[in-house]
Amino acid sequence: MRKAEKPKGAQNFMDMHARLYPGSCVKDITFIVTHRCNLRCTYCYEHHKGEEKMSLETAKKCVDLLFAEDAKNAPLVNEQDAHGLILNFIGGEPFLEIDLIRDIMAYFLSRAIELKHRWAVNYMISMSTNGLMGDDPRVRQFLKEFEGRVSISVTIDGDKAAHDACRVDCQGCGSYDRAIKMFREVSGPDGRRQTKYTIAPGNLTLLASSVRHLVLEEGVDTLHCNCVFEEGWTMEHARELYRQLKTVSDMIQENGLDTYVSILDWDAGDHVPDTETQNWCGGDGKMLAFDVDGTILPCLRYSSLSIGNQPVYRIGDVESGLAVRPDDVARLDALRRITRQSQSEQRCLDCPINQGCAWCTAYNYEKTGTPDKRVTYICDMHKARVLAQCYHHNRLHLLDSAHAAKAMNVPQDWAVEIVGEAEYEALRALEREATGKNAVEMRP
């Protein structure tokens, strides 16, 4: 039986590259072009914004370093691990520095052509924007110039009420009416529409109505959504998340939609075997980020823009190089030694539904002072998500037997605390009907 999958039209650059060049990888390179933003989103993890911006001189040094590292087949940048590049431009709001971004791309391509380098063709531009500068003629020209090479994600947090609850400007005014215009003008591959919805305490109660708006009114068929990792979630939030996701599931099925909503993905809620040691995060050299001053970071969230009072967790800079200084080497080595086991409490390792429970290594560092201590504020939200997934996929299975049924591995006491005894028994009955197993056999 098949599991729920992303729509086939939503294949990304990494997917295509893997098919064209088996065994080689695409590397994610981020340019933090500015710390400035024209919004003040209440849930934003970049809570130390300022006026800093990258100079063109620094940006050119970043580009030169990438080509130099590749030329010497360096451990972090080489033909196998960086056969292709995804060039991410981020802020702050990246389009505030659209002129710089254009200059960076011009220099990058001129160097690639000069060197007859594979990156002249094996690259993609990725940008996430709040959409407020969609009417700027410089932005429009850039998108036209790099059409087919640039992937733009305009963040829309659902309907106007949900979006404006958290995504406000410097005057505290909502931004939906300004952002939705660019969102409607920007489509993904094959004209498909996708966006990212960040679930936070301030907009949780509007989740279902927001998904309905995005899917039925705005034509979104791929919706990436997750709960913020930060502190602030309560058991009541977990109960509300289950209610909201159940409503989302009903809406999808009642309308016969093939919509992909990531938080309802099938692949969560089992137990990860003890032999699996992989860290959730790729911030150990798999990604690289250049901050505005040319400091090299394991990922953008290690920027002073985000981590605040913690020392910058750098692994190099454009002057001294990538992982050359002893302290940079030590930090990179420390990241690479992190495993699922080293950073997790025993209760997380023993959890029967720990598959799909996410964390952020950089937020670990921001909150605890070490990237090797896992922060678990989303624990109850993950439990609620898994319960909703069981509801969603077992009902889908009853409508279409090709859709895989889902065992409910959530312990009874955990489930009852979130959904209550009656709903728990209803979920078990649904599971029995979908899987054909008896209740005693399935009970954790």
Predicted feature residues:
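Radical SAM/AdoMet-radical enzyme domain recognition
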Residues: 67-90, 97-228
